[in-house]
């Protein structure tokens, strides 16, 4: 018998196939069961999902497209929702294995593509109390967030300029003066 079961089908399909957590737990009570899905818990939980829907819901296209600065949504090529969900699943399973080693108990764990995509834009999320805060925004050309944190086209190619500390700003100013 398996110690861990992981799948990414919709949970109602797992129930129909008899491979849902409750059915398998009846066979192996200490089973670790990881269900990965497209959407967060709630009204969309049972809907099919994919990398791009997760990116849209998390705001990746908005942020990557510099829409706050008048840009347009940008299609995400990273597939971070899919790969990130795999990483989240691996972490959840490792935590469950640790719990099982300490307690002898199996458990149900779950992750979602949209959760992985939220990690991709975690720099723009609100505080836990729901209040907002000033945050860097990608410009509409998707080249940077500020004059000293941007990509510039030069006669020799592209330059990535990142000047993050005040003393380096002063040093750059001295060199350019």
Where are the regions that the model predicts?
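An anion/phosphate-binding loop that grips the pyrophosphate of nucleotide cofactors and donors
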Residues: 2
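N-terminal Rossmann-like NAD(P) cofactor-binding subdomain of oxidoreductases
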Residues: 5-63
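Acidic, glycine-rich segments within the central catalytic cores of soluble metabolic enzymes
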Residues: 42, 51-53, 57-177
């Amino acid at each position: 018998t398996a110690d861990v079961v992981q799948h990414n089908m919709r949970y109602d399909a797992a129930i129909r196939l008899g491979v849902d957590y409750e059915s398998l737990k009846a066979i192996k009570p200490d089973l670790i069961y990881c269900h990965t899905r497209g959407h967060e818990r709630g009204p969309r939980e049972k809907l099919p999902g994919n990398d791009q829907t997760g990116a849209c819901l998390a705001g990746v296209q908005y942020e990557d497209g510099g829409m706050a600065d008048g840009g347009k949504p940008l299609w995400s090529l990273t597939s971070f929702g899919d790969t990130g969900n795999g990483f989240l699943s691996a972490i959840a399973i490792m935590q469950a294995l640790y719990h099982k080693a300490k307690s002898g108990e199996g458990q149900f764990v779950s992750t979602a593509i949209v959760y992985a995509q939220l990690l991709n834009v975690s720099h723009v999320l609100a505080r836990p109390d729901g209040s907002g805060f000033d945050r860097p925004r990608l410009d509409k050309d998707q080249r940077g967030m500020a004059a000293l944190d941007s990509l510039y086209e030069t006669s020799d190619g592209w330059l990535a300029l990142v000047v993050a500390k005040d003393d380096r700003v002063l040093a750059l100013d001295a060199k350019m003066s």
